[in-house]
């Protein structure tokens, strides 16, 4: 426990702060002492001696006053202190094994002569810090560095003849290894030129291979654009279904044979192999393009038993589609895959919707009872419309199949999208019910609710603000005030003429009744509420 001088116990925080203050004072004292010592060490004892000598000469002449005597005494003390501190510093540095550094050996800053000024303004190559008699005679700085001159660093120290000769010999020795590299450079340039004669011959060689490869690379890229890896697996599954349906899988095999034939037309080794691989990919795409033509028939079986005639017609259409695919194989590759799924609904459509061709035309298909079908039905009318110009009957639906099969070369897209067509099958099943359903409900479904629940007029300040002050008076204070009655009727009659003359008559009758009966303000307020109700303000 620390106590003050009076014997009182100090607060621990105050005691701690007092200790910190003492430590800070000690630290400041040491710092001031160091600064003083450094200032003493920087002083030149010779200058102090010169000043003392001048004062002694003045003392001999008898012109030394009291102030100069005091100054002389201070100079003598500082001289003794400087010598003492220097001696201590030298001893400390010797103990540490370091050489003492004194600042007194540096004279006052010297101004440059006119010659040095001129030389600084117009430097010579020899003044450059990067100058070398043989390697860099111009003194140019290396790239990325600013020019540096010895004159800006300090005075040049002229080299003696021996040193100059030794430096020249050293520079020659250093220069000897450097010149050898330049000769090989021209040799390498010549070799490069010699190789250049071969390089031009080799340069034209690379270009020829690329031209034949672009088609293959383009085919490969096109193949990659229509996922090639997934395509092969689906076709093997459907072919058995096609066989069951009664259609032979010969078309895919024929394009494969044709694909085997193209490679020979003029390629060497690797090029032939690349072409074979690319053509095999193309053949796979062709086979996949023709397989879908046979794939459409399978969907009808799950739909209805009328698949047999429809499948035949689908087979004929598929053959025509296969011909179109063979003729236009490049177009389907560039066309986006989304269209193919829309073809499937059109394929089963002919067999399911021949009896109701007129239902396909109207855009009101979205009004069918099942909620899920409307979106696909909204999408269907535009698809069915193009076929109708060719023919109003279901054969017209087959017309879009001829141009659209090329859009669906990838069979991979068709298997996952059968879930989309089922709504169309259901629509075919409900074909008998379609004509009875009105088309207006579709608009009603899309319409937003018009009835909005509003608060009562008594609770809306916007409407109560319209009520006259005479009516808004409390019932307790309303009894003595019977004069405002005519004003209420007048205000009501004046406000209502612009709105509706019929309401004005009713309001006049209502206002006349209280006048004749001489009832209280409550009756007039009820009449006002009736007027407001007639205007539609109290509709809930």
Curated annotation (Swiss-Prot):
Motif (Nuclear localization signal 2): 71-78
Record field: compositional bias (Polar residues): 307-330
Localisation per UniProt entry: Nucleus
Compositional bias segments (type: Basic and acidic residues): 112-129
Annotated keywords: Flowering, Nucleus
Biased composition (Pro residues): 177-186, 203-215, 226-241, 294-304, 334-343, 368-379, 402-424
The UniProt record lists the keyword Nucleus: yes
Tissue: Moslty expressed in leaves and flowers, and, at lower levels, in flushes, roots and fruits. Present in rapidly proliferating tissues, such as shoot apical meristem, leaf primordium, and flower organ primordium.
GO biological process: flower development; regulation of photoperiodism, flowering; RNA processing
Residue segments, region Disordered: 90-429
PANTHER family the record matches: WW DOMAIN-BINDING PROTEIN 11 (PTHR13361:SF1)
Role played: Involved in the regulation of flowering time. Plays an important role during the early flowering of precocious trifoliate orange.
InterPro entries: WW_dom-bd_prot_11
Originating species: Poncirus trifoliata (Hardy orange)
The UniProt record lists the keyword Nucleus: yes
GO CC entries: nucleus; spliceosomal complex
Intervals of motif Nuclear localization signal 1: 16-23
Highest taxon, organism lineage: Eukaryota
This protein's name: Protein EARLY FLOWERING 5
Disulfide bridges in this chain: none
């Amino acid at each position: 426990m620390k106590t003050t001088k009076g014997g009182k116990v100090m607060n621990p925080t105050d005691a701690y702060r007092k200790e910190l203050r003492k430590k800070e004072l000690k630290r400041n004292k040491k710092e001031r002492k160091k600064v003083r010592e450094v200032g003493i060490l920087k002083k030149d004892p010779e200058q102090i001696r010169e000043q003392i000598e001048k004062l002694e000469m003045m003392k001999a002449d008898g012109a030394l006053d009291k102030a100069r005597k005091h100054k002389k005494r201070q100079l003598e003390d500082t001289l003794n202190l400087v010598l003492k501190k220097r001696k201590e510093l030298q001893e400390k540095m010797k103990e540490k094994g370091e050489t003492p550094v004194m600042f007194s050996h540096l004279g006052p800053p010297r101004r440059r002569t006119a010659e040095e000024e001129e030389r600084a303004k117009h430097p010579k190559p020899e003044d450059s810090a990067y100058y070398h008699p043989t390697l860099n005679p111009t003194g140019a700085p290396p790239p990325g560095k600013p020019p540096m001159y010895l004159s800006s660093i300090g005075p040049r120290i002229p080299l003696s003849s021996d040193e100059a000769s030794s430096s020249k010999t050293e520079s020659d020795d250093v220069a000897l290894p450097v010149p050898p590299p330049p000769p090989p450079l021209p040799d390498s340039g010549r070799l490069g030129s010699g190789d250049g004669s071969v390089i031009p011959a080799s340069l034209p060689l690379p270009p020829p291979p690329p031209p034949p490869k672009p088609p293959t690379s383009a085919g490969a890229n096109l193949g990659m654009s229509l996922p090639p890896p997934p395509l092969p697996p689906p076709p093997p599954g459907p072919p058995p279904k096609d066989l069951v349906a009664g259609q032979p899988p010969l078309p895919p095999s024929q394009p494969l044979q044709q694909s085997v034939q193209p490679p020979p037309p003029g390629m060497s080794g690797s090029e032939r192999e690349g072409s074979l691989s690319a053509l095999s990919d193309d053949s796979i795409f062709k086979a996949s393009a023709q397989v879908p033509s046979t794939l459409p028939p399978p969907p009808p079986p799950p739909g209805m038993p009328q698949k047999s005639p429809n499948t035949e017609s689908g087979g004929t259409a598929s053959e025509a589609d296969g011909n179109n695919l063979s003729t236009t194989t490049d177009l389907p590759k560039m066309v986006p895959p989304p269209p193919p799924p829309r073809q499937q609904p059109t394929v089963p459509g002919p067999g399911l919707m021949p009896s109701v061709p007129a239902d396909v035309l109207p855009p009101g298909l979205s009004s069918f009872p099942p909620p899920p079908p409307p979106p696909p039905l909204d999408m269907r009318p535009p698809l069915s419309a193009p076929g109708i110009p060719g023919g109003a009957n279901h054969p017209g639906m087959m017309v879009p199949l001829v141009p659209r099969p090329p859009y669906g070369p990838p069979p991979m897209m068709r298997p996952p999208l059968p879930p989309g067509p089922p709504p169309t099958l259901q629509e075919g099943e409900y074909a008998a019910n379609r004509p009875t359903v009105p088309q207006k409900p579709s608009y009603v479904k899309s319409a937003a609710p018009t009835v909005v629940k509003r608060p009562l007029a008594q609770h809306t300040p916007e409407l109560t603000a319209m009520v006259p002050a005479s009516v808004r008076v409390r019932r307790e204070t309303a009894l003595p005030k019977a004069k405002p009655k005519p004003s209420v009727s007048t205000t009501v009659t004046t406000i209502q003429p612009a709105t509706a003359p019929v309401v004005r008559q009713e309001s006049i009758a209502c206002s006349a009744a209280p006048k004749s009966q001489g009832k209280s303000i409550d009756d007039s307020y009820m009449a006002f509420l009736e007027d407001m109700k007639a205007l539609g303000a109290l509709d809930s």
